Amino acid sequence: MAPRHVRLLLMLGAFASGLVLCGAIILLAMGPLSSGGPQVAAIGGPFRLINQDGKTVTDQDFRGRPFLAFFGFTHCPDVCPTTLFEVSEIFRNLGPDADRARAIFFTVDPERDTPPAIKEYLSSFDPHLSGLTGSPEDIAAVAKSYRAIYRKVPLEQGGYTMDHTAIVYLMDKQGRFVAPFSLKRTSEASTAELRKHL
């Protein structure tokens, strides 16, 4: 098969994979699943992971304050740093009220994202961000509980990148899912939305 045809097939495969990922994101963004009446979707749940300081933390450590949750990885070239920058802007806008909320960065790349790697990465963002990692099994479990999907994608030049759900989750003070948190608005509007849940 000619190299040009191989490249075309690879591009089509990547496009198809992207459609699957987008479909999953759209399904989550449509809102909670319901059977027989309104209810809060079963998104989120217990976890036991390691933070950027090497300390074991659980979902209970984040109770009592609403939080934003996002899945990503430190080698992410665009979506992750952009999202974390926008989340950082929201916390800066909150001023003294920033201590009444939290944000969690769940890695989808525990192979490379050790606590020191995450700590260095998050040093560029707001200190209210907690970066969490763990064993591949632990990460798979928490991703499943949030209905987040991710997969390793080999790169032609060697190494790999990660495809992953790019939703920001708004969770309430009890760790229950509220809604996907849109960043496609001004940081002031996003701040006002988070402030409603403090």
Where are these regions (language model features)?
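Short, hydrophobic alpha-helical segments
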Residues: 197-198
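Thiol/disulfide oxidoreductase modules built on the thioredoxin-like
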Residues: 138-193
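Structural microenvironment flanking redox-active thiols in thiol-disulfide oxidoreductases
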Residues: 82-142
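Short active-site neighborhood of thiol/selenol oxidoreductases, capturing the structured segment around
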Residues: 60-87
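Short, small/polar residue-rich loop motifs at catalytic or cofactor-binding pockets
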Residues: 42-44, 66, 163-165
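Hydrophobic beta-strand anchors of alpha/beta hydrolase catalytic cores
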Residues: 68-69, 103, 168
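N-terminal targeting signals for export/organelle localization
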Residues: 1-46, 50
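A short beta-strand-turn-helix
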Residues: 47-67, 91-94
